Amino acid sequence: MRIIAGAFKGRALAAVGKGDAGAHLRPTTDRVRENLFNILSGGRFDINIDGARVLDLFAGTGALGLEALSRGAAHLTCVDTGRKSLDLIRQNIAICGAKDQVKILKCDATRLSKNGDAPFNLIFLDPPYKKSMGERAIALALAGGWIADDALIIWEEGQDIVVPAELSLIDTRKYGDSRAYFLTRS
């Protein structure tokens, strides 16, 4: 796993090893991550990564959020509870030298409380597949003020999702057994 483009381009991220089977640690592949960011930078969606506030729910290794930082995002908040995930996120932040731009929240994304900071305009949601955790996490993020009105949400899942009434599905991409859903606020 590596950072694909931007200020941290080419940096090899910490090896996942055996991962964390209990937490279903399943990093987004370099190929899928590159494709997602090509879509984001292609101008189809009304999002500017440069200066963005990024929220990475079920952050895993933090690679999606760190890729956004590498490409000009101003801030990243990673949310995860897995011990192995949190260790990998910390290692990857150090590899990228991004400590001052990243906040780590050790909390369950399906139990988010109210956001005390500014809302986020780029959200990555990559819950364990086939656990139906994404719906709960996104509902709490919406209710808790985590998601800005102009936000773009990229939700990676291994099954069909239930799109909350407050959101609109604007695109779907399929990558093997996973799908990336692109959503905005309605």
What positions do the PLM features span?
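Class I S-adenosyl-L-methionine-dependent methyltransferase catalytic core
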Residues: M1-S186
